[in-house]
Every structure is written in C-alpha cells, then in structure tokens.
C-alpha cells in the first residue's frame, strides 16, 4: 500500500466479472495491495448476505469487548453503529485499544442514506505520515486506555453488553488472555479495565507501519468543550466510561488529540453508499469512520480474525 495521500480503495463492479470470482483468493490479494475493496452494482440482497459473508469472512467473530453501541441483526452480524446521525465518527481501526482485534471487516449497505452517511476510509500509513514528528515521538511508548463498565445502570455500556456475557468468570478469562491488561471489579458491581497498547503497529504480511490507536476517540478533548465540561462536573476523568493517557499515565495534550482526529479525517476517502454495496477492509492497513447523515440509513458490519 502506498503511503501517499492519493490512496483510495479498489472498486469492483459487474464489468470486472462475477461477484464470486472476487470473494476468495482475489480478495486476499486486493486487500494486501489496496487495503480496502468496494463491491458496487452487484445488488447483494439481504437474503444473500450470509452466503457472501461466509466467503469474505472465514471465521466470523462476535463483537466482544467492543465500545460502540450496536445491535445484533444476525449470526455475528451487527448494525455498524447506533451513534446519533448528526455526529461524525472519527477515523479508527476496530478494537485497536484491545490486544485482540479483527483482521478484516465487511460493511454492507441495506438501506441507502437519505443524504450524507458515507463511510470514510484512510490508509493507516498515510495517516501516520500526516502526523507531526513531535506528535509521533510523543506517542512512541504507546497509550494507556481505561474503561469503566457499569453493572447495568450507568453511563455508557455495561460489562455484560461489552463482553456479551453475564458470567464474571467468563469475562475474566477473556481479559486474562490479553497481554498488558489489568482489571478490577468495583464495589458497585462495575468493572474497570486498564490496557497499555502501542500507538502504531506493523502489518504482519506487508510490513507496513500504520497509525493504530483510538487515543483521539477516548480523550475528553474530542467531545468538544461543552460536553467535556459537563462531564467534568459529574465525574473525574478516570471514572469516565473511556479515558486515555500516555502509557506512563501522563496526560495527553488536547492539541495532539485534535491533530490526530483532524488529519485522519482530512486524509480519508469517502465511500458513498447504495443499497447492495459491500465494503471489505483490512482492519490494520485501513481505518474507517462515518459522516453525518439525514433520513434513513442502515449499514451492517461483520468481522473476522
């Protein structure tokens, strides 16, 4: 994959041949070379989605330890997000705050947005190259994520929703398998998780170094001044549902947070949706987000290891 800002996902249409010809070995090649592939004009029907996903995602994963609000709609198929339509979701790699992240994502458009609603995608190498040397140096030792998950009543997601489990022992087994993770059960029944993760990673096949963290999404500065101030009146930063610092616990300069967010969005290419479209993404090479929209929009997502 190129590190320049001219990157764009590959696009496959019926003129390139039958859909099934592109969903196995050819797709593997395209994802390594281009990072993301859009399939347009094939008219994939909701009734045929499972068959397509079985080819694209060889081992579909449940959305365990995910922080985005989503709903199940099928066998390890979810709504892409349920954040309010008027909000922009900044660029990120799925579960990059975790020691376990999906290798591949598949987004499917069931209902065309009324207006807006594109899924922006960005090369992680281009995003890294767009950041200032000072910022990259500051993040060299990684970041520390803190998650506060309530027990069913509170702000944000519960630990039961996050881990799709009701058994504490099952959650602990999951966390124990993730290096760099500590946790504690709180007196109110909630769960606090701390994880130290790198800010960049190297793709295991291509060797490409990419920006790979969610520091900007987990930092209060990304919420805007009014929202951040309102939350500060309710609870200290370390008790927010999501909080991030540098790996040593020192605070991250809000200016860095805004630089990460803004340069990622500026380098992104919008994938505009039509019903029946499919977008497949290498979750290390390429980050994704969501533009605001009005009217109907239904985009589904599934993941694989």
Task: Spell out what each predicted region is.
Residues 63-93:
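A gly/proline- and charged-residue-enriched helix-loop-helix capping module
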Residues 58-70, 295-305:
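C-terminal end-helix/capping segment
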Residues 9-33, 39:
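An N-terminal domain-cap segment
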């Amino acid at each position: 994959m190129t590190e320049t800002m001219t990157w764009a996902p590959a696009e496959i249409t019926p003129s390139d041949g039958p859909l099934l010809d592109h969903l196995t070995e050819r797709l593997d090649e395209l994802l390594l070379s281009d990072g993301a592939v859009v399939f347009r004009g094939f008219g994939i029907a909701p009734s045929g989605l499972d068959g397509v996903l079985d080819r694209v995602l060889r081992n579909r994963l449940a959305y365990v330890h995910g922080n985005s609000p989503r709903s199940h709609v099928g066998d390890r198929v979810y709504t892409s997000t349920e954040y309010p339509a008027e909000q922009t979701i900044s660029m990120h790699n799925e579960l990059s705050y975790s020691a376990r992240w999906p290798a591949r994502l598949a987004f499917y458009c069931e209902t065309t947005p009324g207006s807006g609603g594109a899924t922006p995608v960005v090369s992680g190498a281009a995003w890294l190259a767009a950041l200032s040397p000072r910022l990259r140096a500051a993040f060299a030792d990684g970041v520390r994520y803190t998650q506060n998950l309530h027990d069913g009543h509170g702000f944000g997601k519960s630990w039961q929703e996050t881990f799709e489990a009701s058994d504490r022992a099952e959650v602990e087994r999951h966390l124990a398998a993730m290096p760099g993770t500590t946790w504690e059960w709180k007196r109110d029944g909630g769960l606090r998780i701390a994880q130290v993760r790198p800010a960049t990673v190297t793709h295991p096949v291509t060797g490409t170094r990419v920006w790979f963290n969610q520091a900007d999404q987990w930092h209060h500065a990304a919420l805007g001044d009014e929202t951040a101030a309102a939350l500060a009146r309710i609870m200290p930063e370390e008790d927010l549902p999501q909080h991030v610092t540098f790996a040593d616990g020192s605070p991250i300069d809000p200016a860095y947070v805004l630089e990460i967010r803004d340069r990622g969005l500026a380098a992104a290419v919008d994938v505009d949706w039509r019903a029946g479209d499919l977008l497949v993404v290498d979750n290390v090479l390429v980050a994704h987000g969501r533009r605001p929209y009005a009217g109907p929009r239904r985009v589904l997502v599934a993941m694989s290891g």
